[in-house]
Amino acid sequence: MTMNTTVANITNPAVPTSSLHSPHLTEPFRITLIVIYTFVLLVGITGLTLMISLLKTNIRSLTTIAFLNLMVAHFLFLLTVPFRIYYYATQTWNLSSGMCKVVSAMVHIHVYMVFTIYAIILTLRFLHYYKKMQWTEFYRRLHALGASALVWILLLPIMVPLVLNQYGNSDDDAKENQCFKFGKMIENPAVYALNMILSIFIISVSCVQTGIQAIILHAMIRKYGQASRSQQEFWVQIKNLIFVLIMLTCLVPYHLFRLKYLNDTVKLSPANEVFLAITGLTCFDMLTFTGRGVCQVCWT
């Protein structure tokens, strides 16, 4: 009788077993994720507090507007980080599946928003360096704020519903009291192709901008030699280099790994979570630019 019950439990997927609700992350991975996200939260909160001074700078500057949008992206992401820390610590998700989708999707939205803003800032500064663009600020503050709001109005209504609609649609991904297990959706050919295209695009753009930055710095060093450090433009390019380095250390590794992860989501899921958590370290950018005053970050 006992043997028949055991066999029935194994063969009938409707019978709840401990294996159905077993955590998908081992303790070393959970500890790593808790440490990373805790550090991200502390650094992010500190950076946001310090970057408030940015509001006192020239709000019409294109670069300042880009930084303000970067702050908003970090802020929205940081709101969801405590939920991740709690889940990895308790291994239990007690909130709704919809909230799970929001928290899980936000880290991806953060990655793409931060990359987009980085790319815009670097492109603007490259164009300014090569004197391809003279207009660097709006004529009125209201126009600047309107342009900033337009970016979010256009992106969020498209990006958020698309991501939330795709997350967790597969029944195989749904686990009671568990979250962040949406790997099955990648088996959809369209989702797989979209992820591959996005990863390759981000890697390619990052490499191109790294190359351009290296060329600019090399040209300035050859032109001014040891006097380079006395040139204001040189320090602007150094700040650009920091953006590039953050992209190369936080965003590119995740997307390089993702090219492999997309072909083996089950086995590589824990490692993918760690690489995804590392993207949150982009919040460090706010601390980087608050040394001698935020005003020095932006050229006008």
What does each model-found stretch correspond to?
Residues 29-34, 63-65, 69, 73-121:
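Extracellular TM2-ECL1-early TM3 structural module of rhodopsin-like
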Residues 215-256:
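Intracellular effector-coupling site of seven-transmembrane GPCRs
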